[in-house]
Amino acid sequence: MNKIRLVVASLLLGAATGFAQKPFNASGTGNPIIPGYFADPTVKKFGDTYYMYATTDGSGAGFGPAQVWTSKDFVNWTLMPMNWPDSHWIWAPDVMKHTDGNYYYFYCQPCMIHCGVSETPRGPWKNILGESEAVLVPDRFVTNAITLDGQTFVDDDGSVYLYWGTWGIYKGFGCGAGKLASDMKSFTETRLIPNTEATDFFEAPFVMKRKGIYYFMYSSGSCHDHTYRVQYATSDKPMGPYTYRGCILETNTDGTIHGPGHHSVLKEGNEYYMVYHRHDNPHSNRGFHRQLCVDRMEFAEDGSIKPLIPTHDGIGALASSVVKSKNLALGAKVRASSFYDADFRPEYAVDDNNGTLWRPRGMGQEWIEMDLGVARQIQTIWTQFEYGTQFYQYLIETSVDGKHWSVFADKRNNRMAGSPMVDFGKVKARYVRLTFTGGQKNGFGGAVWNLKIFEGVEASAPQQWLGLTAADWNGREWQNNEGMLGGAFTLKEGSARIQRIGGRDALVLEPGTTLEYSHPLLSSSKEHTVSGLVYRSGKWQSYEAGSCLSSGAITLHSSTEPLVITNFRYYNWKQEAAEKAYDAETDIVRLPVADQQKHGLVVSLSADDFVVNDTVPYLENRGVKGYFEARKLPLVVKEVKGKKAFHFEGTQVYTSSFMLPATLQDNAPYTLEAWVLNDSISENECVADFTTSHDELEKIMLVNGTEPRCGVINHYGWYEDAGYKDMKELAGKWQHIYICFDGRMEQVYINGKLVSEKDIQLLVKPSQFITLGRNAEGDWPFTGYLHSLKLWDEYLPLKE
């Protein structure tokens, strides 16, 4: 989508509606309220804290991980990881506090609802029925209600109701509803709310009560496009029957608020606020890069809901701001090593807008530099990377003159995900430079929603400041790679080593050894939690580490006996007892860093290396080391229309002796080139399957078929696959197929003609081998000729 057109349309819309609507890419917009891709929000206020539970979007089809966003002011949000759910899909979470004092967490997978329980709204959670994926509501638990999108409602008498449903548009279908028993494990009453009461009901029910009226709200249309919208019906009973009242939220005129829906409602005093998701700008393919927004609801005197006018402004703060310093980066002059295109300019990193971001052109080390105009004191820098649920590695430097640079924060070994990433220091500087150096996943690069620079110490974000495992010991330092503060424990005296003991890797401090971690923000007088695990008397025990904390330092010392320790943690907030107990028995997860050591040419096969009529049981790979071996029947080399070619007759299948390199995992850029001739092209024929996994978006499969949706390249993604509608016309002709993907856009060429170009996202997993002649599942046999095949683990645009 062209952003210039969108801005002009936004301005015209504001004039037409009589108020000054901010353009979606203006500085300081209040919507989206979260920097990242999230959907299906449930917002709750427990105590003085707002909690935002949502589907993790932008990761395929809601594949997690589990998380919650928290805020004290409804403007500055912090991402906090949760232990559960740990399932493949984590969709549409909802949390409620029961009269028993516990919190209940409902979420769904297709097509079932699960329920967890915890003593805190952050967890740790456990399935109320025992096993992690035990099902509370199976599919069609209520006849003709497809189970999805569970949402609770608590009535004035304390009764708890659950509503659920999707694809409720069919005749006789609708939304499931049930009154939960006091144990929250069963229902005392159920009913189908049919689509004759809730017109066009598709999914995402939400029920609230106001002045004796029950409002049954829901989403209609397709969540992938502009038709998604919110409608509602009313009743005088929580289970209905309901009377349809109309649509209250839909795509705006200029399309910058696109496909709004799957909402929840926050009541604050006498005000009601609708929190919903909408598609990103510019709109991503598939519609699974959604963002969270909020707007005020209004009611007419008769109790009907007035149609919402969705805004880019949002509602602002609902409490005093936790941030006390001015954002020095806002509107600063900025330059960068590169930017993807005009939709992702460097200026978008300093506009305090959660809907715009700077995206560098490449996936390697890229930088962005801010000029504050004059030298200013800097004590805190917040960085909100594109994906807060995965870790980034980076370096922040400062300079007075733009020539001589000093390190402000070195996170080049960081393995902690979070948003914002918070770095502290104390320096006077005019220039600030952020350099992305790597991270958890390939193909995501160092894109940034916002960079915020503060003169004061801004430490309000509740985070894990220290997180250390035995693997973080490098022989001289114990590096804080899983903690927000970075840095390291330094060896002051003695010696330490890594040892496997009691089923865990541990750091052993020999007698007389002292390690010290220094940071000015550490203090026993400030709210905190510090803990670890130590091995004593033949078992692992909680380490009450409070005594090791002093003003500005943590000191670990072993006296006459070794100190065997791991999982050392420090939080800048006070954990509840359940959270402490969970940490006492749970290891810190230390995820690997994505492999960025490119190989270049990974696969290279050519029939020109053989003589016509050769029988070829082995194909030497001239890319990375290795070969392809026939499983049964070997190929024969033929001469076809001026080219030597391997003749596949549907029975030949080859597998590689090597794995797909890790540099091609996740969303990594790649380039694929092949010469193929097929006399009789079937619907789906697999030339080469480069992956052994078989889940959504995990495939890189070269296909030669007539299927217009996926007949050229198949990723197991309905929107991401690509075909060619005129493929039948190429039967009996040589096809030069060239596919290149830069981590965002994939171009597909056949004989030099661009047949597909769209933004996609891949989730390629480790693959044990590459398959020729069929896919890894043994289907889609290829019956044709292959002259050559090449695969690179880098983006190489097609040259004219």
List the model feature ranges, each with a label.
Residues 465, 474-481, 490, 500-502, ...:
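Extracellular glycan-recognition modules
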